């Protein structure tokens, strides 16, 4: 059903949306795992509480002191996110534990609250703030806990991976070895003896005994070989089988026969069977194998089932080895985990957890693995991979650090002498410093990509293979980097970086999430006997045995969702079967389920080559947020969901009216509550882009829960928007768009279409040293009066426009102390050198930066009595106090007026002093009581709100105020920090990189005058010219479909834009326009007679303001719909128009494809890249200039550039480039002398790289010389 009154986008494809609550939150991977790490519930698999409870209770060696854990407490961060970023601090929560210490000798029982350390706190966006910088812990692939059988270099191996403890590896070569952590080797017999096994137990496990009755004078003998083959009963208790079935089989005996004795492990033949028959023995014990296994290794183990050590050494080493094994498999040190235990039981077909038999079962399984060539376990399968997300990684690190804390506690307990020793029983720096170092140095802790909202979400959903499974970049082959069938709908096959990390850094699929067991799961519709029942999340362990069909296999009817046809191609693992709909188990949800968040924003994805889709998803993350961006005309339907999940816009938390609204805050009032929302204004990100929010509501508007009340510069109407819709033509224009070059119209610059704001932060630090204090002075700025008006106390004012090399902070550094003569002092005073003990070291604006000062943060730390005290800036503390106090008194006065109205309406008199808002005691309000039960009930509601909400917040504020000063983390020598932010506006320029959503990237080669751009017969100019040769070879045909569809829709929109005054148009014409549009797009005839004129006007305004469509990926999109729209409007079939040259006015011979395309400006700007080199460093070996801006390198003349010069025949220019301008040392020196003397002559010699080549040839024993 189409909602005619309210819609964001017209939908071309019919898509079944499931309920919003089932859609996984895109940041759930980070936020959910971190919350479970902090969870106080013991059920959480890796919470702090579970880690701590493993080590308690603690008992000292002499059993005199006993420590018991009572509870833990985690307090909220004392600083705000904004404050920590300004002050370059850490955002963290404080962790306390409550313990009871029992000292038995002294009858002491002490209950203590102990500070354990600081735990880094996560923001709403899923990142951490470390040293004032947004950082993120990306997830990591690792091998799942359990048992694996595999072959490596033609060796059969078995490995056991526990959660805690050493990895056990069974290797079968000439000897049967067991390896611990790939270091310590044991033979299997030593391993089994140390675990407590003996011969009898070992053979009772692998063999079993049966009684066999021997009947003399018969041609048959009765044995039990295999219960499944050739058996029949003669007597009640015996099973018969012919002698042929036991020839060559292994058995042993327990009873000795008369005269002849049978040795163990004899092979029976017919003669020996006859020997048995000749003796009068009726019952005989035989040992048979339980199952068929490799007997050679079993006999080897049996024969060598003694330690191969001398008897003298055995007394010393045996006890050591046994103790080693006991400690190795101690419960607290060796733990399989719940997942590992399940995998082992399932693989070995065990029902009970019997520690005595588990290793014997493993040996039996290994022998089967060798004998029958059982299939190897695949480590690339997601069933065998765990995801270590940020909560799990922090839990592992916290466990490692807390072991050190326990060692410290044990040391204190064992050296306990006085009661005061218990005060310092825990060293809190172990956890605080350990976690801080982990975030600063670990390769999984990365600088958050905040280029735009999409980049931030994608970075949150990244998964790394590096170092997780022991993988290094250099040694990774194609098998590790390649996609696997288990990745389907769980890991995106497209989204991965280009270069040496390809395939090693992956991204979660759009509808996948990490479950509580740390496996990737995705959402499916459940089908049982052809009926679609509901929705569930399943990981690869469960869905590998199911038949799964495509999302297009169902259709909606009035009776619900049903299958389209009786038979389908169903997928099971990596095979496809033709199955009836009754046998289908699971159905996919939608086409975006396969791909990642970035790839889901590419329209017509199925029409593009996979390599270009990869580039498209990577390019979108590099797009710069513009000042005024646009929503794409053609979208995929996911723009709104990604925009809402990015937290870049603000949603209302309650139903109510807007009480106040401006560009800095929005206040919403409800019947019982008032909430204030503060907007982010010109906030700097890690990539120097901005986040700027602006209000979408006005005073008096009614909002509901979930309504968008504030948008940002990267989102529009809630949808993510990163670029602009431009009118494009695929044609050649005087050779300027050669290869991937892009031509732009100057009208784009005039309209400021691709303008972006970048914020640069500059910091200067004032320190105290032996010579004195570093100071800030106005003298660095010079004596110009205009400049002095811009400066205040040595620092430039907010709002001033600055250029490169301008001084913004006048920093002065003290000189070494020395005595000046009276004449020197007089000389400096006369020439007004007041600061003659200092020299200047000002902070200046770097090259290529000019902009406006938008913020100056000055943090002072005062000096007193030769000691430096870290004090907070008084104004900053006042600011925070003021905000919280204002909120407290606003809400308090609101409820106070409610109480006054209640008392006044019910004519209840009370003294004015009790409820005077200027001088009020809160306790007086709590004392107010009424005899009327109804009034008293309402009063109690207001009292509870005041006590629970307001007083709690007041207490939290007091706690924060106390802890503000405690956690400043500066060096001892720092006395002042000054941070200045400059906002720089950057226009599009020649050399900037631009891209579409289909991987069609290029560099702006020229910006053409508006008058010279091609135009159509109506005089409409082209904004963008692309090379048509860039489409067929790249196979990204999706951009053409976008151009045709967006071009036809924009033409419809142009009809509406011409109607400026809606009062002049009749309602009949409005209805006619709406009917035509719905007929074109939806192919439906709508009856507008059921709507009144006001509703028709509302629909008409919606279409006029926004006529955007969405085409869902991988759906059966009918291209004929686009053709129908084009025909209805009256354009050529392929959107081909006749264009005219803007310079000559002549028309082009051929028709040109013209339409609209969504284009973005990428964060590869020419201003940041181009620089000049006059002098610089040279390479030691080749003596050529170094490369790169950071090395002050030169421009490299590569092989293709040489070809270009050769093609033009520029021999002398080429000679210069390859000799004196490169690595001809003698030629360089001579040219420098000639330039000084004014001689226009350049003689080149032999380049140094040629000398290197000569030495390399000579090293190969070739006698070669330069003639």
Swiss-Prot record:
Keywords: DNA-directed RNA polymerase, Nucleotidyltransferase, Transcription, Transferase. Gene3D superfamilies: 2.40.50.100, 2.40.50.150, 3.90.1100.10, DNA-directed RNA polymerase, subunit 2, domain 6, RNA polymerase alpha subunit dimerisation domain. GO terms for molecular function: DNA binding; DNA-directed RNA polymerase activity; ribonucleoside binding. The keyword Nucleotide-binding does not apply. InterPro entries: DNA-dir_RNA_pol_su2, DNA-dir_RNAP_su2_dom, DNA-dir_RNAP_su2_hyb_sf, RNA_pol_bsu_bac, RNA_pol_bsu_CS, RNA_pol_bsu_protrusion, RNA_pol_Rpb2_3, RNA_pol_Rpb2_7. Transmembrane segments: none annotated. It catalyses: RNA(n) + a ribonucleoside 5'-triphosphate = RNA(n+1) + diphosphate. Its EC number is 2.7.7.6. GO terms for biological process: DNA-templated transcription. Belongs to the RNA polymerase beta chain family. NCBIfam families: PRK00405.1, rpoB. The RNAP catalytic core consists of 2 alpha, 1 beta, 1 beta' and 1 omega subunit. When a sigma factor is associated with the core the holoenzyme is formed, which can initiate transcription. DNA-dependent RNA polymerase catalyzes the transcription of DNA into RNA using the four ribonucleoside triphosphates as substrates. This is DNA-directed RNA polymerase subunit beta. The lineage of its organism: Bacteria, Pseudomonadati, Pseudomonadota, Gammaproteobacteria, Oceanospirillales.
């Amino acid at each position: 059903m189409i909602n005619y009154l309210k819609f964001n986008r017209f939908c071309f494809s019919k898509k079944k949306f499931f309920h919003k609550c089932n859609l996984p939150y895109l940041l759930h991977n980070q936020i959910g795992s971190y919350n479970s790490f902090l969870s106080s519930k013991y059920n959480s698999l890796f919470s702090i509480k579970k880690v701590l409870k493993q080590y308690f209770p603690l008992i000292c060696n002499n059993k005199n002191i006993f420590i018991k854990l009572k509870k833990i407490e985690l307090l909220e961060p004392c600083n705000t996110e904004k404050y920590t970023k300004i002050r370059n601090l850490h955002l963290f929560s404080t962790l306390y534990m409550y313990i009871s210490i029992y000292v038995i000798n002294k009858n002491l029982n002490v209950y203590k609250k102990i500070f354990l350390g600081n735990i880094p706190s996560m923001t709403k966006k899923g990142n951490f703030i470390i040293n004032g910088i947004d950082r993120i812990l990306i997830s990591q692939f690792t091998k799942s806990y359990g048992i694996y059988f595999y072959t490596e270099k033609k060796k059969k191996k078995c490995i056991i991976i526990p959660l805690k403890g050493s990895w056990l590896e069974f290797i079968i070569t000439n000897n049967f070895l067991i390896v611990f952590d790939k270091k310590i080797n044991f033979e299997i017999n030593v391993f089994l003896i140390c675990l407590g096994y003996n011969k009898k137990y070992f053979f009772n496990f692998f063999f079993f005994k049966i009684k066999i009755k021997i009947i003399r004078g018969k041609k048959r003998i009765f044995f039990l070989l295999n219960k499944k083959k050739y058996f029949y009963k003669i007597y009640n208790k015996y099973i018969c089988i012919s002698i042929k079935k036991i020839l060559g089989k292994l058995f042993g005996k327990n009873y000795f026969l008369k005269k002849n004795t049978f040795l163990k492990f004899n092979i029976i033949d017919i003669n020996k069977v006859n020997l048995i028959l000749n003796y009068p023995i009726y019952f005989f014990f035989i040992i048979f194998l339980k199952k068929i296994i490799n007997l050679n290794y079993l006999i080897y183990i049996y024969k060598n089932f003694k330690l191969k050590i001398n008897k003298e050494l055995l007394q010393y080493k045996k006890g050591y080895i046994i103790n080693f094994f006991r400690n190795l498999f101690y419960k607290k040190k060796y733990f399989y985990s719940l997942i590992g235990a399940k995998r082992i039981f399932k693989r070995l077909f065990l029902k009970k957890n019997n520690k005595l038999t588990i290793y014997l079962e493993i040996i039996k399984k290994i022998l089967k693995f060798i004998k029958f060539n059982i299939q190897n376990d695949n480590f690339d399968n997601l069933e065998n991979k765990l995801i270590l997300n940020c909560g799990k990684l922090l839990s592992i690190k916290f466990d490692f650090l807390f072991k050190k804390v326990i060692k410290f506690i044990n040391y204190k307990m064992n050296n306990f002498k006085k009661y005061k020793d218990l005060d310092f029983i825990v060293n809190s720096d172990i956890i605080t410093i350990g976690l801080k170092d982990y975030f600063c140095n670990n390769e999984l802790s990365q600088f958050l990509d905040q280029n735009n909202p999409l980049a931030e979400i994608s970075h949150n959903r990244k998964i790394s293979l590096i170092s997780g499974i022991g993988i290094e970049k250099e040694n990774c082959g194609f098998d590790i980097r390649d996609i696997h069938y288990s990745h389907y709908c769980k890991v995106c096959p497209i989204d991965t970086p280009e270069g040496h990390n390809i395939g090693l850094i992956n991204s979660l699929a759009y509808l996948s999430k990490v479950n509580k067991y740390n496996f990737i799961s995705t959402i499916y519709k459940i089908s049982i006997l052809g009926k679609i029942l509901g929705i569930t999340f399943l990981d690869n362990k469960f869905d590998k045995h199911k038949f799964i069909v495509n999302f297009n296999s169902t259709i909606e009817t009035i009776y619900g969702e049903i299958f389209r046809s009786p038979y389908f191609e169903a997928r099971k693992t990596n095979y496809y079967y033709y199955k009836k709909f009754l046998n289908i188990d699971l159905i996919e949800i939608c086409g975006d389920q396969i791909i990642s968040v970035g790839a889901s924003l590419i329209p017509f994805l199925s029409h593009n080559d996979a390599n270009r889709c990869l580039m498209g998803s990577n390019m979108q993350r590099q797009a710069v947020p513009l000042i005024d961006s646009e929503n794409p005309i053609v979208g995929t339907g996911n723009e709104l969901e990604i925009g809402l999940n990015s937290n870049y816009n603000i949603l209302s938390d309650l139903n109510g009216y807007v009480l106040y609204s401006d560009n800095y805050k929005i206040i919403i009032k409800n019947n019982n509550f008032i909430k204030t929302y503060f907007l982010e204004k010109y906030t700097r990100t890690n990539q120097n882009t901005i986040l700027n929010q602006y209000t979408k509501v006005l005073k008096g508007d009614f909002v509901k829960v979930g309504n968008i009340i504030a948008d940002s510069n990267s989102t529009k109407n809630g949808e993510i928007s990163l670029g602009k819709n431009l009118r494009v033509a695929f044609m050649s224009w005087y050779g300027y768009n050669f290869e991937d070059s892009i031509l732009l119209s100057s009208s784009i610059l005039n309209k400021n279409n691709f303008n972006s704001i970048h914020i640069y932060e500059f910091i200067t630090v004032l320190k105290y040293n032996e010579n004195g204090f570093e100071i800030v002075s106005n003298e660095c700025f010079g004596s110009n009066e205009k400049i002095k008006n811009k400066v205040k106390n040595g620092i430039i004012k907010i709002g001033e426009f600055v250029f490169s090399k301008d001084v913004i902070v006048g920093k002065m550094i003290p000189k070494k102390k020395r005595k000046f003569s009276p004449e020197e002092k007089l000389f400096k005073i006369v020439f007004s050198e007041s600061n003659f003990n200092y020299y200047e070291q000002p902070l200046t604006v770097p090259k290529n930066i000019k902009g406006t000062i938008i913020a100056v943060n000055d943090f002072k730390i005062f000096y007193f009595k030769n000691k430096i005290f870290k004090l907070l800036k008084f104004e900053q503390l006042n600011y925070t106090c003021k905000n919280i106090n204002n909120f407290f008194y606003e809400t308090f006065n609101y409820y106070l007026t409610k109480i006054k109205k209640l008392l006044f309406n019910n004519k209840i008199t009370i003294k004015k002093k009790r409820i005077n808002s200027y001088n009020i005691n809160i306790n007086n309000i709590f004392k107010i009581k009424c005899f009327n039960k109804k009034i008293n009930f309402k009063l109690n509601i207001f009292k509870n709100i005041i006590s629970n909400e307001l007083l709690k917040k007041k207490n939290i504020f007091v706690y924060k105020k106390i802890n503000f000063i405690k956690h400043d983390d500066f060096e001892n020598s720092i006395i002042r920090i000054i941070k200045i932010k400059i906002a720089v506006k950057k226009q599009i320029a020649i050399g900037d990189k631009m891209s579409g959503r289909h991987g069609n990237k290029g560099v702006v080669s020229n910006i053409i005058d508006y008058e010279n751009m091609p135009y159509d017969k109506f005089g409409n100019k082209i904004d963008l010219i692309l090379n048509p040769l860039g489409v067929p070879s790249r196979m990204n045909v999706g951009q053409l479909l976008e151009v045709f569809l967006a071009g036809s829709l924009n033409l419809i929109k142009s009809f509406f834009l011409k109607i400026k005054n809606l009062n002049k148009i009749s309602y009949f014409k409005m209805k006619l326009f709406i009917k035509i549009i719905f007929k074109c797009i939806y192919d439906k005839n709508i009856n507008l007679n059921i709507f009144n004129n006001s509703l028709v006007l509302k629909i008409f305004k919606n279409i006029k303001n926004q006529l955007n469509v969405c085409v869902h990926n991988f759906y059966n999109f009918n291209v004929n719909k686009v053709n129908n729209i084009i025909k209805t409007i009256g354009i050529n079939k392929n959107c081909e128009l006749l264009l005219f040259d803007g310079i000559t006015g002549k028309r082009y011979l051929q028709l040109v494809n013209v339409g609209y395309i969504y284009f973005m400006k990428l964060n590869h700007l020419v201003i940041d890249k181009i620089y000049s080199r006059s002098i610089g460093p040279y390479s030691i070996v080749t003596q050529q200039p170094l490369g790169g801006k950071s090395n002050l390198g030169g421009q490299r003349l590569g092989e293709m550039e040489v070809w270009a010069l050769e093609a033009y025949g520029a021999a002398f220019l080429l000679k210069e480039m390859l000799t004196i301008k490169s690595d001809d040392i003698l030629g360089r020196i001579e040219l420098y002398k000639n330039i000084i003397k004014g001689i226009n002559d350049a003689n080149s010699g032999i380049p140094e790289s040629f000398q290197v080549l000569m030495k390399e040839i000579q090293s190969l024993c070739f006698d070669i010389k330069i003639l």
